[in-house]
Amino acid sequence: MNINLENYYSTRKSVFERIQDASTATKVLMSLLMACLTGIMAQIIIPLPWTPVPVTAQTFAVLCSGLFLGKKYGCLSQILYIVLGVAFIPWFGGMTGGLDVLLGSTGGFLIGFVIASYFIGLITEKYADARNFKKMAAVIGIANFALIYIPGLAGLALWFYLTQGI
């Protein structure tokens, strides 16, 4: 298939519809693969000296999960990422895992991943005209800052209060 400017929009629509029309088993498998991609991207870390929470590339995978898989399966991919990370796969940032990560300084960000993935999937599914680059970049920006950063800061503030009394 040769993609050029003339057939770009029809190709974009075709790919999106193909994912949405896939079988349930295929969508669950894609959710698991997106959870794995999130775990891999979590290993790209930029530590910040003023906070215990580093910047990671996993946010990109989180936002793409809602974009590619839609609200239900994008959200499922992030729930799988969290559940498997808490249960036995050390794939959170810095190859960490376990319940202490979810209940620690990064727990609010992990909860925000589920919310952001659902929101982006909802917008992508509900508003077909939002599937262009400029509109989706705005939606992703809102989801990144409002739906990941705000719950993350709330979780970090709670963690500081409970551990340091600040």
Where are these regions (language model features)?
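Structural signal for the C-terminal ends of transmembrane alpha-helices
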Residues: 68-72, 119-127
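Interfacial aromatic-anchored transmembrane helix boundaries in multi-pass membrane proteins
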Residues: 43-54, 82-116
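Juxtamembrane/transmembrane-helix boundary motifs in multi-pass membrane proteins
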Residues: 18, 22, 26, 50, ...
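Alpha-helical transmembrane segments in multi-pass membrane proteins
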Residues: 33-41, 62, 66, 77-85, ...
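Alpha-helical transmembrane segments and their helix-entry boundary regions
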Residues: 74-78, 101, 137
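Residues that define the loop-to-transmembrane-helix transition and helix capping
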Residues: 72, 106, 134-135
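Membrane-embedded alpha-helical hairpins and interfacial helices in multi-pass inner-membrane proteins
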Residues: 127-166
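Hydrophobic transmembrane alpha-helices
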Residues: 2-77, 87
